[in-house]
């Protein structure tokens, strides 16, 4: 698939044709979810945030809006939508959820469900000062180009773990966020 010419219709048809298989065992019992917000444009964008440097975990990292599934959340999808509203003021009613990717285990002990949703191009994002220092949009075609991601093997507690690294403008995209973007690319048939 040629990533440079990716339209929203191309993305949607490929995502719908290749629905993710979600059959995974996990050791992580705490649940979390992130929203992968794809901005509806002729050449779609991918909305990302940079976490506040004042946070205890993952300070300053590029991330999708998201967080832990609360008792008040009916599902992982509900949690992703709630967190997106809290972090960047995306109203849940403005998100067209098109599916989920297979859950990912985080190094902090969560099983994270990536929720893919389409959002309008004219939303007035408002970053939560406590949680988010920046909100930015990356062209989806660039984000899904697998050649931009570089592997790094990390050894932690006797286990090897591969993380992916990339830059977009001044933003360093790595770890779980880069891994989820790569999984999205592979899901729609982008070849490594």
UniProtKB/Swiss-Prot annotation:
GO terms for biological process: nucleoside diphosphate metabolic process. It is an enzyme of class 3 (hydrolase). Its EC number is 3.6.1.-. A motif (Nudix box) lies at residues 67-89. Residues 29-160 form the Nudix hydrolase domain. Mg(2+) binds at residues 83, 87. Coiled coil: none annotated. InterPro entries: CoAse, NUDIX_hydrolase-like_dom_sf, NUDIX_hydrolase_dom, NUDIX_hydrolase_NudL_CS, Nudix_NudL. GO terms for molecular function: coenzyme A diphosphatase activity; hydrolase activity, acting on acid anhydrides, in phosphorus-containing anhydrides; magnesium ion binding; manganese ion binding. The keyword Magnesium applies. It holds the Pfam family NUDIX. Gene3D superfamilies: Nucleoside Triphosphate Pyrophosphohydrolase (3.90.79.10). Its cofactor is Mn(2+); Mg(2+). Keywords: Hydrolase, Magnesium, Manganese, Metal-binding. Belongs to the Nudix hydrolase family. PCD1 subfamily. HAMAP family: Nudix_NudL. Probably mediates the hydrolysis of some nucleoside diphosphate derivatives. This is Uncharacterized Nudix hydrolase NudL.
């Amino acid at each position: 698939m040629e990533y440079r010419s990716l339209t929203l219709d191309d993305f949607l048809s490929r995502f719908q044709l290749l629905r993710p298989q979600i059959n995974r065992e996990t050791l992580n019992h705490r649940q979390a979810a992130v929203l992968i917000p794809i901005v509806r444009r002729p050449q779609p964008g991918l909305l990302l945030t940079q976490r506040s440097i004042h946070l205890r975990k993952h300070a300053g990292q590029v991330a999708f809006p998201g967080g832990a599934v609360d008792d008040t959340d009916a599902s992982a999808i509900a949690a992703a939508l709630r967190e997106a509203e809290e972090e960047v003021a995306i109203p849940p009613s403005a998100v067209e959820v098109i599916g989920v990717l297979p859950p990912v285990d985080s190094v902090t002990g969560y099983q994270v469900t990536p929720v893919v949703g389409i959002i309008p191009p004219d939303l007035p994002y408002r970053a939560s000062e406590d949680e988010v220092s920046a909100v930015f949009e990356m062209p989806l075609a660039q984000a899904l180009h697998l050649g931009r991601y570089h592997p790094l093997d990390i050894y932690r507690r006797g286990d090897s773990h591969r993380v992916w690294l990339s830059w977009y403008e001044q933003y360093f995209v790595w770890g779980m966020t880069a891994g989820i973007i790569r999984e999205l690319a592979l899901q729609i048939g982008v070849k490594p």
